[in-house]
Amino acid sequence: DQADAVRRTVGHLLLYTPVVHPSDFDSAISYLIRRLEENASTENFLSGVFELTRSPHIFEREELRFRESLAAFEAAPGAPVAHRVQSRLAEQAFGSGPAGSAADVGVGARVDGGGELPEHAGVRAGFDNAADTDTAMPDNREWGRSILKSAQTTTRGQALVDASAVESGAAGVAAIERVVAETRLAGAAWAARSVDERSRILHAAGGMLSARRADLIEVMAAEAGKTLAEGDPEVSEAIDFAHYYAESMRELTRIDHAIFTPVQLTVVAPPWNFPVAIAAGGVLAALAAGSAVIIKPAPQTRRSAAVMVEALWDSGVPREVLRFVDAPENEVGRALIAHPAVDRLVLTGAWETAALFRSWRPDVPILAETSGKNAIIITPSADIDLAVADLVRSAFGHAGQKCSAASLAILVGSVATSARFERQLVDAVTTLRVGSALDATTVVGPLIEPAAGKLLGALTVLEEGEDWLVEPQPLDATGTLWSPGVRRGVVAGSAFHTTEYFGPVLGIMRARTLEEALELQNATPFGLTAGLHSLDPDEVGYWLDHVEAGNLYVNRGITGAIVRRQPFGGWKRSSVGGSTKAGGPSYVMGFGSFTPVVRTVRESLSLRGVSDGAREVLEASQPGLEFDGFDAVRAGAVSDQRAWDDEFGVARDDSQLGAEFGEIVERNVLRYRPTAVTVRAAERAPTYELVRVLLAAARAGARVDISSAIPLPASLLALISTGISSLRAASVVTETDARFTARTLEVRPARIRLIAPDGAAAARALHEALDGDPDVAIWSGVVTAAGRVELLPFLREQAVSLTAHRFGNPYPALAELAL
C-alpha cells in the first residue's frame, strides 16, 4: 500500500536489495545490518511504520514531526538550498576557481575577519583544502567529457617546451651557466619583496591553478596517461600547495630568537608520475621562502609542467624568478643539478637518483622524497570487505605508479587462509577496467613507458615458492597497458619483499601474529607509507607505537595524501637530506637558514620557564659557561619548551574532519617522534653552543652520541653517567676533527648535528669525505636560541590518518584512541 501511494504521487519507485549467490550471503550481511540499524533508529519514520495504525503515541510523534517540518519550510525564505551545487562548467565560464576561494574573495583572506593571525596560528586560521570535482553533478560529467575529447589532440605546453629546450654539448653547458647566473640574481630581488607581497602572489597562483584545472587535467591525460579520477585531485593538491605555503611562509617571521634568510636559487627536479602537484609543490615552497627557482621537468611530462609554470607566470610570478629549463639528460643536465651556485635541490624520485646526484656534487643541499616499498597489514579483526577495497585502490591507482602505492599485503593469522578474502580480492582485481586514460570508464590506465627491466620481471617472473593469484597480462602491443597482477607466497628478504617496482603488481605475505607482520613491514630499506586494517584498538595502538614510516593509515587507503591533512614524507631511505614533510608546517623552513637575533643579556640566574629536564642539564653545564653563554643557553631552553608546548609535543589534528557536524569522522594527526643523532662540536666551537644543542636534544627526548673537540664540563659528564638524565647520551667522545671524520666513515650515522665556526665549510668537507652518502643527513646551521629551529634535527615527523567511523556512525574505540 505504501509503495502504491508513493508511486501514484511521484510516478516512479525504485526498489533495491543486495543480490548474492547463497554461498556469498555473508557479503550482504553488513549492508543489511546497516539498513536495519538505520531504519530502526527513532529518528527514522520507518521505525514506527508498523505501529502507526495501532499506537496513538507513534502516530502523534510522526504527525508532530511532519507538521514541524512543514512549518520550518514555510518559515524559511525559500526551499532548502542544495549543498552539492558545484559546477565546473559555470566556473569555467566565469573564468575562475570556485566561488569563495582565496582567489575570489581576496588573496590572503582570513576566516577570522581580517587582520594579523594570532601567534603560532600558522595556516590554521586561513586555509581550506580545494574541493575535488563532484562527478555526481551532470555539469561536471559534461565538463569531464569535454576534457577527454580535447586531450586527444591537445598540444598545450608544447610551445614553452620548444622555447626552453637546451641543446647538448658545450653550448648547452654555457646556456646553463647563463640561466643560473640570471636566476640567482633575480632571487635576490624576489627575497627583498615583502612577505605580504609574496603571499599575495602565491594566493593568486592558487586561484590561477584553479581556473586552469581543465587545462592541467587535459595535458596530464594526454601526456602522462592520468585518468580523470587521478588527474583531478592532483590539481587540487597543487592549488592547496599555493594557498598553504602562502600562509605558512608568514610563520618564518614569527620564530623567536632567529632571523630567516632564504637561499637565492633552488632547482626543482619533479617526477613524471605527479607532473603538476609535486612540481608545483617544490616551486611554490621555494617561492614562498623567497628563493628563485629553476624547474627541470621530467622528460616524460614536460608539457604538464609547462602548463603549470605558465599558470604561475600569469598569476604574477616573475618570469626571471621562475625559469623553465628543458635540459637534456646528459652533461648539460648534470651541469644544472651539480652547479655550485645551486643552494637547494628538490627531488622526488628513486633513492638511486639521489645517490647519483650526490655523486656529481657530494655537498648538494638536497631535499628529496624518494622510494617506497609500502605494505598494508590486514588482521582477523579487520572488516574484510573494506580492507580489500582499500588494498586494491592503493595498489592499482595510476597503475601502481605512485611512490606511496601498496605493493605488499601482509595477512595475519586466519586472513592468510581465508577463502572469502581471497575471493573478494580476486573479484576486485579482475573487475578493474584497464584502458586508455582518454576513456572516462578507465580505472587503471597505462604505464608511462613500456614495461622493462625490473618492472617487466615483476610482471612476468615468479620467485621460488611464489604463484599467481591473478596473473598480469599485456593488453596491447605497446607494452604500456597491463592488467593488474597479484602474486602469492612472497617471503621475508626476497626481492619482491624489499624492491620498489612502480607498476600494477601486488605481493601477498603471511604472518602468524601482528608482531611478526610488523617485522615484515619494517624490514624494507624504506619507510614512506604504511597501512593497517583492524578494528581492534589494542592492535591499532600497538601498531602505531612500532611502525617505521612517515605516513600511517588505519582502516583506509594509503595513497592520496592531502596538503596539511596528511603532510607527506618518509623515513629511512624514503627521504634524503634534512627535509621535512611537504604540505606540512615546517617545509618552507628548509629553503633558507637561520641566524641568531641579537639579544640583551638578562642580568639574572633565574631559570623560570625552563623545563625540569633542561634545568638539570643547564645547571650541570654552568661551570663551563661564561655568563653570556649561560644566558643564551637559558633563552634557548625557554624557547625549546615553548616550541614543545606549541608544536612538537602535541599530536594535533588541524583538519578536524566532521567537527562541524559534531563528530570527527577521520582523524588526521601530525606528531613528532625522537630520533638518534650524532652531535659534533668541531674544533674552536664554543662550549655554550654545544650545550644549547644538547638541551634541544634533551627536550626532544632523542638519543645522542656526543663528539666534541673539547672536553665537556665534568659536572655534565657526571650527570650523563647517572643514566637517568633527560639528556640521553649513548656515548661521549673527545676527539679531533680528523678523528671524528675517520670514525664517521666507519659508523655513518643517519643524522649529524654539526657545530662549527663555519658550519657550511665543515659540512661540505664531511660530505666530500663521505662521497655524498645520501644515507647521512647533516644539519650545520648556525646555532640559535630558537626551539622551533633547533629541535627539528632530533625529531621525525609522522602523519597519522585514521578512519574514526563505521559506515557514517562514530566508532569510539578508534575515535578516542590516544595518538
Task: Give short role names for the model-derived ranges.
Residues 1, 169-182, 191-212, 219-222, ...:
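Catalytic cores of nucleotide-enabled group-transfer and carboxylate-activating enzymes in metabolic
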Residues 1-99, 107, 752-760:
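Positively charged, amphipathic and often flexible ligand-engagement surfaces
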Residues 54-162, 593-616:
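Intrinsic disorder at enzyme termini
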Residues 251-320, 385, 606, 653-720:
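Conserved small-residue-rich beta-alpha loop and adjacent elements
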Residues 311-316, 338-339, 344, 351-491, ...:
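ALDH superfamily catalytic-core signature
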